[in-house]
Regions:
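Structural and coupling elements of P-loop NTPases
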Residues: 1-608
Length: 608
């Protein structure tokens, strides 16, 4: 029987090993039965999370160690999901700061740590992946201390304990050359260093809703830490917003806590514990869930606003309905309502009259994840080019989101990368050596200039560079920026692309289609190296003769089509273009498919 509770969050950059470390903590602490089959990457519950190796939605888990229940919250490691991070930190008594022993301190680490320090958390520093051949643990420790200083950590926070670890091998040690036996030193340090918060158990029940899950059986499930009193099944409760206004009222139908990664029903939730409750259908994240006698809301951390938007409509291409099952604006609306309820980082507005939806999010990845999920669910969509969301200050000055970009690369590529960032109105903030012929560049640049830049960076560094981006602040608008220089190669008619035609057109530019791909008028089938759009015929086969048959068309050698992510394709769009997304395909297209109508639109736009 546990009699104490510790709530701890893990702060780490993408792919610094936090999910693997949590897996081994659970296994070594006995959170699973001996005969239980345990999947790898336990905390990455979503399909996309396991594929990409990133945490998208924060989720709690629990382990028992020496009569203490340790609730562990695995926080997102990508800047686009910072809305999750901010809420999760409010549930924590302490934090594990996990840093790769070779890569060192990275932007996402800095971002989340700054928020944790502002909330008064005192992190335990774990320098992970000590089994790497290029580990530089001592240097990384110095960098970490400098980071704490730069983030205005207080004296107690600067006096952080340090462990060296390998999450994959399942050990942690206070000494760099210690015995490296197991993870017990980390579990013991959590108990000794992280102090449980003091809560008033005698007061009426109250908790802040920090996470929200949709459950087909229970309905809306709210996750939070009980800050006072106890929660009992079947008691009357209500939800009040940050202004103290009642949002909902009802019965607490079910209450759960986490054992391992599973939800276990309980009758009573104690102050200090992280629980899941059901029974209120209108309550939302940042609402206070409480006893009917409570009228004072719990303060919630403000959430940073979205920085980018896209417009989504039904698929209007000639191929609509051939690959997907969810085709109507009503189905899109219902899906976006569901997303906005579960993910406060996403908002949307409906444009009356044309059945289009303006969806706003924190950045490229957040919007790409949503589109990828909808695609896998059977939706067919038409998506506009991304737009940056601007602000104005009190004096009326136009402001735009600025990001901090950290790049690690070979020295030979640095001049090309600096030149590419200058064209995107980036400002070089720092440049330093990180090893033999290695450089680290840090830029501040407008978000609008960075759409799809990751693929460009990887091309410039021949796949050897590492780039990381994080929201920095809103800054003064940097002026107009040059768009895509390449003209579009546009299909002339509907049908199937032919190898012979593609082969002869390859000299005119990069082709996006291969033999037998379906095409239609207005579809962008390639890019020209020159400015200006061009309508081409990708269906023109070789003329037949007595000596040749049509089958010889397919013997030509075609350049393989470049594989691009949704984010890359969105970044390529000009203002008069769109991206068709279906479960099986993504196709670049002109917003207006008919060439005559396009010309009329261009003339009217020029006249205006």
């Amino acid at each position: 029987m546990t009699n104490q509770i510790r709530n701890i969050t893990i702060i780490a950059h993408v792919d610094h090993g936090k999910t693997t470390l949590i897996d081994n903590l659970m296994k070594q602490s006995g959170s699973f039965r001996e005969n239980e089959v345990v999947d790898e990457r336990l905390m990455d519950s979503g399909e996309l999370e396991k594929e990409r190796g990133i945490t998208i939605l924060a989720k709690p888990a629990s382990i028992n160690w020496k009569d203490t229940r340790i609730n562990i919250i695995d926080t997102p490691g990508h800047r686009d999901f910072a809305a999750e991070v901010e809420r999760v930190l409010s549930m924590a008594d302490g934090a594990l700061l996990l840093i790769d022993s070779a890569e060192g301190v990275m932007p996402q680490t800095k971002f989340v740590l700054s928020k944790a320090l502002k909330q008064g958390l005192k992190p335990i520093v774990v320098i992970n992946k000590l089994d790497k051949a290029d580990q530089r643990a001592n240097e990384v420790l110095d960098e970490t201390f400098d980071l704490f200083v730069s983030l205005d950590a207080n004296e107690e926070q600067l006096d952080f304990p340090v462990l060296y670890a390998s999450g994959r091998s399942g050990w942690a040690d206070s000494e760099l050359d210690g015995s490296r036996e197991n993870l017990n030193p980390l579990l013991d340090l959590i108990l000794n260093h992280v102090k449980p918060a003091n809560f008033e158990k005698e007061k009426p029940f109250a908790m802040l809703s920090t996470l929200l899950y949709a459950d087909s059986f229970l309905g809306r499930s709210l996750v939070g830490r009980i800050t006072q009193g106890t929660a009992k099944a079947n008691q009357s409760i209500k939800a009040i917003n940050l202004k103290g206004e009642k949002v909902d009222e009802g019965k607490l139908t079910k209450i759960f806590r986490y054992e391992g990664t599973k939800k276990v029903p309980i009758e009573i939730g104690e102050a200090g514990d992280i629980v899941v409750i059901a029974g209120l259908e209108k309550a939302n994240v940042a609402d206070t869930i409480c006893d009917l006698d409570v009228n004072e809301p719990i303060s919630a951390t403000p959430i940073d606003p979205p920085t980018m938007s896209i417009t989504i409509t039904v698929n209007t291409s000639p191929l609509a309905g051939k690959e997907g099952k969810k085709l109507t604006s009503t189905q899109i609306r219902d899906r976006l309502i569901q997303e906005a309820q579960n993910n406060v980082g996403i908002t949307f507005n409906e444009n009356e009259g044309n059945d289009s939806f303006v969806v706003s999010g924190r950045g490229e990845l957040m919007l790409e994840i949503l589109l990828t999920q909808m695609r896998r669910e059977g939706f067919e969509l038409t998506v506009s080019p991304p737009k940056v969301l601007y602000k104005t200050d009190d004096s009326g000055t136009k402001l735009e989101p600025i990001e901090e970009i950290t790049m690690d690369l070979d020295e030979e590529y640095s001049s090309k990368v600096i030149d590419s960032m200058n064209r995107r109105k980036g400002k070089l903030i720092d440049l330093k050596d990180t090893g033999k012929n290695k450089k680290r560049l840090i830029f501040h640049a407008p978000t609008r200039g960075l759409m799809g830049y990751t693929s460009k960076f990887l091309t410039l560094t021949k796949g050897n560079g590492v780039i990381n981006r994080i929201f920095h602040d809103y800054g003064q608008f940097e002026g107009e920026m040059e768009g895509r220089r390449n003209g579009a190669l546009i299909a002339m008619e509907k049908g199937k692309a032919v190898a012979f035609a593609i082969f002869n057109l390859q000299a005119r530019g990069e082709m996006f289609v291969t033999h037998n791909d379906p095409v239609y008028p207005g579809m962008i089938v390639g890019l020209s190296p020159k400015p200006g759009d061009m309508i081409i015929n990708v269906m023109k086969g070789k003329k037949l003769t007595n000596m040749r048959t049509q089958g010889t068309d397919e013997n030509v050698v075609l350049t393989p089509v470049r594989k691009m992510s949704i984010a890359e394709q969105l970044s390529m769009l000009n203002t008069d273009e769109a991206l068709e997304i279906t479960p099986d395909s993504c196709r670049l297209r002109k917003s207006i498919l008919d060439p005559n109508e396009r010309k009329k639109s261009e003339k009217s736009g020029a006249a205006a």
